[in-house]
C-alpha cells in the first residue's frame, strides 16, 4: 500500500500547484463533494443553507473551510506516509465531534482527484492520479484505524 519515492514526488509536485491557491482548490473540491454527494452537506451546519453552486461559489466561509481542509491534507501528504502526529487530532475531531464516516472521505478523495485533474491536466496525468489515489487510500486506511481505536465505526 505504501508509495514509492517516485510516486510521492508526483503527489508533491501537483500539491505545489494546489498550494498556490489552497482556498480556491478547496472551495472547488467542497463544491464538487456537495454537488456529487448532497448528503455530505448535512454534516456542515454552517453550509446547509447553500443550495446552489452559485451560493457555494459566493460563500467566503466555504472558501475558508476549503483552505483549512487542504492545509491539513497538505501537512499529511508532505509526511509521505509518516503522518501519525498529524492524523491523530484529525481522526479525533472527525470521529468524535463531526462524526464523518469513512465513506465521506472516499467521496472527498474522488472530488480531489477530479478537481486536480480538471485544474492541472498537464501535471496530473494518469501516473500522478494513480499516485494521489494511493496516497489518499493510505490516509483513509490510517484514519479508519484511528476511528476504530476511538470506537467510531463510521
UniProtKB/Swiss-Prot annotation:
Its EC number is 1.7.-.-, 1.11.1.-. Nitrite binds at residue 65. GO terms for cellular component: extracellular exosome; sarcoplasm. Heme b binds at residue 94. It is found in: Cytoplasm, Sarcoplasm. It catalyses: Fe(III)-heme b-[protein] + nitric oxide + H2O = Fe(II)-heme b-[protein] + nitrite + 2 H(+); H2O2 + AH2 = A + 2 H2O. Residues 2-148 form the Globin domain. Pfam families: Globin (PF00042). The modification Phosphoserine is found at residue 4. Belongs to the globin family. This is Myoglobin. It comes from Globicephala melas. The gene is MB.
Amino acid at each position: 500500500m505504501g508509495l514509492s519515492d517516485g510516486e510521492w514526488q508526483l503527489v508533491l509536485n501537483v500539491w505545489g500547484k494546489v498550494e498556490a491557491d489552497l482556498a480556491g482548490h478547496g472551495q472547488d473540491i467542497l463544491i464538487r463533494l456537495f454537488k456529487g454527494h448532497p448528503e455530505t452537506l448535512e454534516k456542515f451546519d454552517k453550509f446547509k443553507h447553500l443550495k446552489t453552486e452559485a451560493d457555494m461559489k459566493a460563500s467566503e466561509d466555504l472558501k475558508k473551510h476549503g483552505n483549512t481542509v487542504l492545509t491539513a491534507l497538505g501537512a499529511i501528504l508532505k509526511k509521505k506516509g509518516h503522518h501519525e502526529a498529524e492524523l491523530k487530532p484529525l481522526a479525533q475531531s472527525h470521529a468524535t465531534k463531526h462524526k464523518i464516516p469513512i465513506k465521506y472521505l472516499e467521496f472527498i478523495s474522488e472530488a480531489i482527484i477530479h478537481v486536480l485533474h480538471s485544474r492541472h491536466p498537464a501535471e496530473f496525468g494518469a501516473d500522478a492520479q494513480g499516485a494521489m489515489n494511493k496516497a489518499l487510500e493510505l490516509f483513509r486506511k490510517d484514519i479508519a484505524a484511528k476511528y476504530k481505536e476511538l470506537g467510531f465505526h463510521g
